[in-house]
Each structure stands twice: as C-alpha cells, then as structure tokens.
Design a protein with these regions (language model features):
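Short, acidic, metal-binding catalytic loop of nucleotide-sugar glycosyltransferases
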Residues: 25-35
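A conserved acidic beta->alpha catalytic loop
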Residues: 26, 41-51, 70, 100-101
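Glycine-rich, basic loop-to-helix element that forms the pyrophosphate-binding segment
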Residues: 68-88
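Short beta-strand-to-loop acidic/aromatic patch adjacent to the donor-nucleotide binding site
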Residues: 89-99
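Conserved donor NDP-sugar-binding/catalytic core segment of glycosyltransferases
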Residues: 105-136
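A recurrent flexible, glycine/aromatic-enriched loop bordering the glycosyltransferase active site
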Residues: 153-173
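A short, conserved alpha-helix in the catalytic core of glycosyltransferases
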Residues: 171, 177-181, 187-214
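Non-catalytic, C-terminal membrane-associated alpha-helical segments of glycosyltransferases
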Residues: 256-308
C-alpha cells in the first residue's frame, strides 16, 4: 500500500535554466518513479519557459510549469509549490531548489521511512567534493559538528539521524503534515523560511530525520559558516545585500517565535561582532542592523528595497 502512494516533486527556480535542466534530469532518472513534477518559476528573465519547451518538458502530463507574476523568492516559490501539490491531492511532496541534484536512488532510499507525520531529508553533499557535507551538520543536543561522510561513519549511526535535516534540499513530507502545519511563510522571501518551516514541524511534533543512505548533491557556498569569535562560532556571510538583509530579519523573527530573547540578543551580538571585528564592513553592518530592526518589529515589507 505504501508503494502506491503518489509523490510530486516541487522545484523552485529563478534564472538558472541549465541547472534546472540537470535537476529535472535527475528527477526523471529516479529509481522510485515520481507521480508528477511541478516547477515554480519565480518570473525568470533568462527564457526558462522557452528553454523547457525546447527540451520537451512542457508537453507531458507528468510535468507542470507555474510561472509566477513576480519574483517571490524561495519562500514564495515553496509556498506556491506546496500549495499546488496539496490542492491537487498528491500524498507526498519532495522539495528542492533548481541547483540540487538528487542521486538516482535518493527517493527510493527516503521513501521507505516516510510516514504521514514525518519530515525527512537526505544527506546533502558538496557536488564538487561529494565526500564532504555541503552544509555542516551539528548533532542535536551536542556540540559535535560533522563536516564529512567520514565524520558520520565514525559514529556508526544506522539508518537515520533523528532531529535534524537540511531543509528544502530533497525534503520529503506528506500532505497530511501540510494539512496540520500549513505552508511556508512567503513574506520571508529568502533565507530563513526553511528554518522557520522546520521549527514549525518541531512545534507540531512532526518527526524529523536525515536518512544516512540517501544522497543529494548541491553546490557549496564557501562564505557560509565563516569562522569568528576566536574560531568558536560561525557566521553565514554573503556578498548579497538582499540575502544579508533577509537573513538578519528572518533569523530575528525565528528566534522570537521559536527560541527566546536570549537567542535574539546572541544573534545581534554575533552579527555586530562579525561586521565590526571579524570582517569589518560598515555597509554590511548597516544592512544587518536594518534587518535586525525590522525582524524585531515584525516588518516584512522592506526586502524589495534590495531587489534589482
């Protein structure tokens, strides 16, 4: 009965048509066949729709392209994608960005663990160095940081790591979970919407786990996890004004909702330290402070100031 359940993949894209094509090829090659694929195009300007027509994707009942009237960011894209799948009655939803590439057996290794009340992720590996994690993993309730597959294998963890996922990179969840938890917050626009959705899962007591034999490949951003504070802490620096602003605003919002004001103060301290002492930048500090202020105020209207 489990094997008969329908699964729809949601891919959010913006101006990366060649990477999108790689992602779609990997989805089509899955050994556990998908029921449907929906691509949410965030009003791309690189000819994404025509490109998909040229590569014979749009003439299939297996595939749906939804082009949004404006760029709503990853948060808006996943909001609309999950909403589409939920409203069309699919049993399970598989989430990813256009630059992700699941291994051919990724879904086949995830799906046996799927229930109507869990939120599963694969291991997310650096597409150029697949023996390393794309995003370092910190085991729940510990200070243990995992950077490589060898780090994980040394722990002899069987089947799954409970309590942790790298959200929206090959995440598998059921429509029953969406019915209970709702959709991602589109007002977040980008950066932090995935963490908010995962925190909401925990609040609703949805089981969370990473499946250790399921692999998902993704480009690594070297600016993420920059060491600071005598190498005791790490900060997600970015050259993008938009991402920096949204990260600070959304992180404050998430800490207010799901952590404590101590966490809010810690994030503020960490950000001020980083752009004052670790990598001094008055312009970035100004953007970060603006994001922090709007996060405290619950104002989600100003990210458009940084859209080109």
């Amino acid at each position: 009965m489990h094997a008969e359940k329908s699964i729809c993949a949601v891919v959010v894209t913006f101006n990366r048509k060649k990477l999108l094509l790689n992602c779609l090829g990997a989805l089509k090659a899955q050994t556990r066949q998908l029921s449907h694929i929906v691509v949410i195009d965030n009003a791309s300007t690189d000819g994404t729709a025509d490109f998909l027509v040229q590569h014979n994707w749009t003439n299939s009942d297996f595939f749906t392209l939804i082009t949004l009237p404006e760029n709503m960011g990853g948060a808006g894209g996943f909001h609309e994608g999950i909403k589409y799948v939920f409203e069309h009655g699919f049993d399970y939803i598989w989430l990813m960005d256009d630059d992700g590439v699941p291994a051919n057996d990724c879904l086949a290794r995830l799906f046996p663990f799927a229930t109507e009340n869990n939120y599963l992720g694969p291991l997310v590996l650096d597409i150029k160095q697949p023996n390393k994690f794309c995003f370092p993993m910190r085991l729940p309730s510990t200070l243990k940081r995992l950077d490589t597959l060898a780090d994980l294998r040394a722990l002899e963890i069987k089947e799954k790591i409970d309590g942790i996922v790298i959200p929206f990179n090959g995440i598998l969840l059921s429509s029953k979970v969406v019915e209970k938890v709702g959709f991602p917050l589109k007002e977040y626009f980008i950066w932090g919407d995935d963490m908010e959705y995962t925190a909401r899962m925990k609040r609703y007591r949805v089981e969370i786990a990473s499946i250790v034999d399921a692999y998902f490949y993704h480009p690594k951003d070297e600016s993420l996890g920059t060491p600071m504070f005598f190498n005791k802490l790490h900060f997600n620096d970015t050259p993008s004004k938009l991402k920096l602003y949204c990260m600070c605003r959304n992180a404050i919002s998430n800490h207010k909702k799901y952590s404590s004001y101590l966490h809010v103060l810690a994030f503020i301290f960490k950000t001020l330290w980083f752009y004052s002492l670790t990598k001094p930048s008055f312009s970035k500090l100004s953007i970060a402070v603006r994001g922090i202020f709007h996060g405290i105020m619950g104002d989600f209207t100003h990210h458009k100031d940084y859209l080109k």
